[in-house]
Design a protein with these regions (language model features):
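Terminal amphipathic alpha-helical/low-complexity segments used for targeting or macromolecular assembly
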Residues: 1-74
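Left-handed beta-helix
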Residues: 74, 79-80, 85-86, 91-100, ...
Length: 181
C-alpha cells in the first residue's frame, strides 16, 4: 500500500467519500470523536507500515504495536496481512476477527461477532470475498479456497464453508425444538 492508496482509504473510510478533501484538522476531529473512524484510521496506517520494508524505523514492528493496541481498545482483530478494499464498515465493533488469508473487495459491511478464517493454521488456501458484501451478526466463514461473490448478503448466525455465487443471499436455517419433559 503506497501513500496515495493510504490517503484514498482515509478519504473513503474516515472522511466519508472518495471525492471529499483530506483536511488534517477535520480528519483529526473525526478520529477523536468517532470510534469507527478512529479504528479505521489507525488500522489502515498500521497496514501501510506493515507492508513497508525495514528502514530507518522498524515499520513492521511499529505496525504490530499499533495493531495490538487496536485489539485491546476496540475488540477487533483484523490481521494486518488481510487485504480489504476501501469502504470497510462496521455496525458494532465487537468480536470481529479476520484472518490474514482473507482477500476482500470494496464496501464490506460487517456486524458484530463475525469470524472470517481458515480451517487450520498453516493452510495455504485463501478466502475471497467480493465487492458490496453484507455480513450479519455472528457469522462464521471458515474454509480454504472459499469464494463469496459480489453483492452477497449473509444472514445472522450463518455458518459458511462453501462457495456463494454473485448476487445471492445466504442464511443457515436454525430450528428450535421444544419438547415437554
Amino acid at each position: 500500500m503506497d501513500w496515495e492508496n493510504l490517503k484514498r482509504f482515509w478519504r473513503i473510510e474516515v472522511m466519508g467519500g472518495e471525492h471529499k478533501p483530506l483536511k488534517l484538522k477535520k480528519m483529526l476531529h473525526r478520529i477523536r470523536l468517532k470510534e469507527q473512524e478512529h479504528y479505521l484510521f489507525w488500522f489502515r496506517l498500521a497496514q501501510h507500515f506493515y507492508r513497508r520494508p525495514k528502514g530507518l524505523l522498524n515499520y513492521p514492528k511499529l505496525a504490530r504495536r499499533i495493531h495490538a493496541r487496536l485489539v485491546r481498545t476496540h475488540g477487533i482483530d483484523i490481521m494486518l496481512a488481510a487485504e480489504i478494499g476501501p469502504g470497510l464498515n462496521f455496525a458494532h465493533r465487537v468480536g470481529i476477527v479476520i484472518a490474514d488469508a482473507a482477500r476482500i473487495g470494496d464496501n464490506l459491511f460487517i456486524r458484530q461477532n463475525t469470524t472470517i478464517g481458515v480451517r487450520a493454521t498453516g493452510q495455504k488456501g485463501l478466502i475471497y470475498i467480493g465487492n458490496n458484501v453484507e455480513l450479519g451478526a455472528n457469522v462464521c466463514i471458515i474454509g480454504d479456497d472459499l469464494r463469496i461473490g459480489d453483492n452477497v448478503t449473509v444472514g445472522a448466525m450463518a455458518f459458511i464453508n462453501k462457495d456463494i455465487p454473485d448476487n445471492s443471499s445466504c442464511y443457515t436455517r436454525h430450528v428450535t425444538m421444544i419438547n415437554p419433559k
